[in-house]
């Protein structure tokens, strides 16, 4: 010790690591699947294969009785996904936060991911552009069960807290049945004119 008794040259300090967990998530294209009974899963697009003519196909998701896939969405893991509930609320979740599932799994309940109430369900999901400037270019259209239609800028949904945001105020017994991106032309029909 006396022979090599030089003071330490490096300094050891306690520091809090300041990093965003999203920086550690690899960017890849994933497929998000939502079922009628409210199950959701994320799977890698690498596992999806194009079948040849006369092929038997491959199971993409295992569903329970009377359950079926209602929406699929191909997005990047860093893309935010908007979830529009039937009660008029919208939620925003990053795609990498959606639990990953194998091709044979049924997925996780949406109640585990979103703060939904018992009577709520998700009517539509859509990707939110990665650049907030791009969101001003898009319009979205809401349609309700009582035949009401409303148009909003997608930019209105750029900041949403974890408990959600009111996307559309609804009358009693009215529910959102669909939300779509509106481009140039919109055609909606009714069996009886109003």
Where are these regions (language model features)?
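Conserved small/polar residues in nucleotide/adenosyl-binding loops
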Residues: 188-194
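Alpha-helical transmembrane segments and their helix-helix packing motifs
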Residues: 128-148
């Amino acid at each position: 010790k006396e022979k090599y008794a030089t003071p330490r040259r490096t300094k050891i300090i306690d520091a809090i690591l300041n990093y965003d967990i999203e920086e550690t998530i690899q960017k890849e294209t994933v497929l998000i699947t939502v079922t009628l009974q409210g199950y959701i899963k994320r799977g890698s697009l690498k596992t999806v294969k194009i079948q040849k003519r006369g092929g038997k196909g491959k199971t993409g998701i295992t569903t329970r009785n009377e359950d079926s896939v209602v929406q699929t969405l191909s997005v990047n893991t860093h893309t935010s996904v908007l979830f529009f509930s039937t009660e008029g609320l919208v939620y925003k979740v990053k795609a990498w936060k959606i639990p990953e599932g194998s091709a044979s799994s049924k997925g996780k309940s949406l109640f585990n991911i979103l703060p939904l109430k018992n009577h709520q369900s998700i009517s539509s999901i859509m990707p939110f552009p990665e650049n907030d400037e791009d969101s001003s270019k898009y319009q979205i259209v809401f349609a309700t069960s009582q035949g009401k239609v409303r148009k909003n800028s997608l930019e209105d949904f750029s900041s949403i807290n974890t408990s959600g945001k009111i996307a559309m105020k609804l009358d009693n017994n009215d529910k959102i049945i669909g939300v779509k991106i509106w481009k140039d032309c919109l055609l909606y029909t009714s069996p009886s004119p109003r």
